[in-house]
């Protein structure tokens, strides 16, 4: 059981293995019980300030004796010039910025009598979260029932402490004090809204910064909850950013099930041993190596992105450039100023601009095949604990930028079932993949292609195409369904010779939804 304390109110949508079991008010707090892939999270939305925070954690610990871990996830200000809007810090050290009891002997500024100078948490849980590699930077959090508004206040704080505090907030330190006395795990994850010394009045990109930080909060929580609820021991600390994007997307869509495609009895998911991931059983006797490659990964150009449409040319110059990847990850819903802390993602009008160049199924399949053929040239093996790993697998992740109809040749009926539609997409790719790879020998025990296709009625369609098992032989994907090939025809909607009323069916689109 894990507790989450935040001043931001957010909800989890019930779907698959995610369910809000209970929600109720206590004092001025909203308490939610969320069952997330089998693990229980207690989410508490609190008022601002140290007293509210201390009261809430005390209540949670008394109400739920099994609660041994607390996370404080929230927005904050930074006094560190290295932090930008949307950056996320992890804090394991906390101090008070407004405690001055130095009149007592040996008491330093920020210290409470009979309490340590700071509250530090360096246990196993902090390492677990750091190993998730969520893009966190470490920093000291200073808590007070006041913010810093000018350079004079900042200088006074530095003079009193002798060093700079990285993050300032109004809750984390109070939670840390109670957590320390209660001997539980505790860390704080803070999404930076702004530098504390930057002017707040008439900030031309204030709304953008609020969208950015609130969306980053949602983005962080989804990835964090996915990994914390996993049954595996996970260390992604040595993964590349491309690998991390693929891994986190797979945990989002399939949770632990995607790992079982390669090794059902996996106990540890580890990086830093040569392949993208090493999948290790509990006895560490039969590890499996997993290479991950990306095909057609979208890149954000400096002058592109939906934020430019909203902000305009001048304001865009000062806006962060990492927005598009986050926006595409999130569910698009409209938000107004009153709803920001309800954790809803911003939705933008792109004026029908295309985010991607549309590709045909054949073109995408050939690009995937070319990447597989190149990777299969590497016949080397990996080692784990001094022994050669006998099996290695290949996962190919592709952002399939395709747009088409699939129509029944006789009835022209719509294909509305998601699973059947996915099967039809897979079937169409198979004929091109097998033809392109017929002369390629693979050193991999199995190759699995994972594609995500933006769809009209679904936020994202997942397509998994596994090859036949067996290393050191030709690449052959699961048998093509000839009947489906006879009964259905793919109609490329980039052409102008189709009639959507006549062809009907399963439509895939590359445009963001608009209301």
From Swiss-Prot:
* Helical 1: annotated segments: 21-34
**Primary localization:** cytoplasm
The protein's superkingdom reads Bacteria
| GO terms classed as biological process | L-methionine salvage from S-adenosylmethionine; nucleoside metabolic process
Q: Where is this region: Helical 2?
A: 206-228
Where, per UniProt, does this protein localize?
Answer: Cytoplasm, Cytoskeleton
Which parts of this chain are annotated as the region Helical 4?
A: 426-440
Q: Which UniProt keywords apply?
A: Cytoplasm, Cytoskeleton
Q: Does the keyword Lipid biosynthesis apply?
A: no
User: Does the UniProt entry include the keyword Cytoplasm?
Assistant: yes
**Sites bearing Blocked amino end (Met), chain numbering:** 1
Mind naming one GO cellular-component term on file for this protein? cytoskeleton
Among PANTHER family, the record links this protein to:
5'-METHYLTHIOADENOSINE/S-ADENOSYLHOMOCYSTEINE NUCLEOSIDASE, 5'-METHYLTHIOADENOSINE_S-ADENOSYLHOMOCYSTEINE NUCLEOSIDASE
A Pfam family annotated for this UniProt entry: PNP_UDP_1
Q: What is this protein called?
A: Fibril protein
One Gene Ontology molecular-function label? methylthioadenosine nucleosidase activity
Tell me the function of this protein.
Answer: Acts as a cytoskeletal structure involved in the shape and motility of spiroplasmas.
Q: Where is this region: Helical 3?
A: 357-376
